[in-house]
Regions:
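Basic, nucleic-acid-interacting segments
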Residues: 1-249, 268
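Long, charged low-complexity interaction segments
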Residues: 242-272
Length: 272
């Protein structure tokens, strides 16, 4: 299979997945790329057996945009990795059923300040994805996952970033962020421990995060264009044209709320 990079099993770009990403970008008021390419993100971990992940680095499909008052950095397409289960003490289990499946990744700018803001953003994103019909976005089924990057500092100097991966409910998103903020605050106030750039998981039973692995920087991934996938010229694909994408937009959640308030006199809090 493609996720193993066996000879003769070349990857193919999923046209429908590209279309979904562009529709999300259109709804967000983003800048849609005319040229895009796919890159190899090189790292070693059991969830990616071929040693690299097909992703987008320099030329994402979508840049900028806004959702629920939160600025968007980019939306790109990549392949999903295997899922890992760390229950029990004898070892970990790896499930490759989803490996290689198209995955849309949306990255926000660092403008979310509280766990509650993060939860509200995730809920609005889920509603948007369902409205557009690009995903059922059921978090309990792994169709939508949140990875929270958390950093706090007592000064103007940026703090060390910690990523909590694969949060699969809005409650776990808010609780994991709140836990990390409290943990980091205690360390910065002189408590035991050290804040290092790492990937952490969320223990639902213990209601705490735990270290999984040290987090690499972008240059450590040694991105380079994937030679097995062609570059894309978006303007050469008729159904990806801006006017076509806009014409297929349904009534978006914030538009529906505004219409309920304007035409029917519904209170804004009830329209939500």
């Amino acid at each position: 299979p493609v996720c193993m990079a066996h000879p003769g099993t070349l990857p193919v770009i999923n046209k429908q997945a590209v279309h979904h990403v562009l529709r999300v970008g259109t709804a967000l008021g983003s800048d849609l790329a005319d040229f895009t390419e796919f890159d190899r993100k090189n790292y070693f971990y059991p969830d990616i057996p071929k040693g690299y992940q097909i992703s987008q680095y320099k030329y994402p499909l979508v840049s900028n945009g806004m959702l629920n008052g939160v600025a968007i950095e980019r939306v790109h397409l990549e392949e999903d990795t295997a899922s890992s289960s760390h229950e029990g003490s004898e070892g970990s289990l790896v499930d490759y059923n989803r490996a290689g499946v198209p995955l849309m990744e949306l990255v926000t700018k660092p403008v979310i300040h509280t766990a509650e803001e993060a939860g509200a953003f995730a809920r609005e994103l889920q509603l948007l994805l369902r409205t557009l019909g690009v995903s059922d976005a059921n978090m309990e089924k792994g169709e939508m996952r949140v990875e929270a990057n958390i950093s706090i500092s007592k000064t103007d100097k940026l703090g060390t970033k910690v990523e909590v991966k694969n949060l699969n409910s809005f409650r776990s998103v808010e609780r994991a962020i709140a836990y990390e903020v409290e943990r980091m605050t205690k360390i910065l106030d002189g408590g035991p421990g050290e804040i290092v750039q790492e990937t952490r998981g969320w223990d639902e039973g213990g209601q705490k995060t735990f270290s999984q692995r040290k987090k690499e920087s972008a240059h450590d991934y040694r991105y380079f264009p994937d030679p097995d996938l062609p570059k894309l010229k978006i303007s050469e694909i008729p159904e990806f044209a801006n006017d076509v994408l806009k014409a297929t937009m349904p009534e978006l959640p914030w538009e529906k709320r505004a219409r309920l308030v304007r035409e029917y006199g519904v209170k804004p809090e009830n329209a939500e």
